[in-house]
């Protein structure tokens, strides 16, 4: 059996920019991407904590150390600058792979700096 599991998560990032006229996607600081094993062009699910919107797009790597979280194209209509978002990727695993799977979760502060990294096999508790 194949199961779809959360693989990488950026928890409580703040939207720094919104660009309607860009060709689509979300731009994320490359350092943040590396921390949670998200690749450029990878599909991400996004939840806006401020308005409840849920949507999908793909990733563009942003400047390292910038803290940039920029929604581009049509997705920019679903956020405002300073909204708090959760960005997630998923992976499909078989029963054997599930044994060793540990998602990477980066908990962010208001400046989009990583304040906690969580690597847990059994759910995550944010402290």
Curated annotation (Swiss-Prot):
**Places the protein is found:** Cytoplasm
InterPro entries per the record? Asp_de-COase-like_dom_sf (IPR009010), Asp_decarbox (IPR003190)
An example Gene Ontology CC term for this record: cytosol
Sorted UniProt keywords: Autocatalytic cleavage, Cytoplasm, Decarboxylase, Lyase, Pantothenate biosynthesis, Pyruvate, Schiff base, Zymogen
Q: What is its main location?
A: cytoplasm
Task: Indicate which residues the UniProt annotation says bind substrate.
Answer: 57, 73-75
Its pathway is: Cofactor biosynthesis; (R)-pantothenate biosynthesis; beta-alanine from L-aspartate: step 1/1
- Biological process annotations from GO: alanine biosynthetic process; pantothenate biosynthetic process
**Gene3D superfamilies in the record, alphabetically?**
2.40.40.20
Note the coiled coil stretches, chain numbering.
Answer: none
Task: Cite the post-translational modification comment.
Answer: Is synthesized initially as an inactive proenzyme, which is activated by self-cleavage at a specific serine bond to produce a beta-subunit with a hydroxyl group at its C-terminus and an alpha-subunit with a pyruvoyl group at its N-terminus.
Pfam families recorded = Asp_decarbox
Cofactor, free-text remark:
Binds 1 pyruvoyl group covalently per subunit.
A single GO molecular function term of this UniProt record = aspartate 1-decarboxylase activity
Give the positions the UniProt entry annotates as the active site. 25, 58
What top-tier enzyme class does this entry carry? lyase
User: What this chain does, per the record?
Assistant: Catalyzes the pyruvoyl-dependent decarboxylation of aspartate to produce beta-alanine.
**Which NCBIfam families does the record cross-reference, listed alphabetically?**
panD
Q: Which HAMAP family match?
A: PanD
Family recorded in the similarity comment: Belongs to the PanD family.
Q: What is the name attached to this protein's record?
A: Aspartate 1-decarboxylase
Q: Its gene?
A: panD
């Amino acid at each position: 059996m194949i199961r779809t599991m959360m693989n990488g998560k950026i928890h409580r990032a703040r939207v720094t920019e919104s660009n309607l006229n860009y060709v689509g996607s979300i731009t994320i600081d490359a350092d943040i991407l590396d921390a949670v094993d998200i690749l450029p062009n990878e599909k991400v699910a996004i939840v806006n904590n401020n308005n409840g919107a849920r949507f999908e797009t793909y990733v563009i790597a942003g400047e390292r150390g910038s803290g940039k979280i920029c929604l581009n194209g049509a997705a920019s209509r679903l956020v405002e600058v300073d909204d708090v978002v959760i960005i997630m990727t998923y992976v499909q695993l078989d029963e054997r792979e599930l044994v060793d799977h540990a998602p990477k979760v980066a908990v962010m502060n208001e400046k989009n700096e990583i304040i906690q990294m969580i690597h847990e096999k059994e759910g995550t508790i944010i402290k």
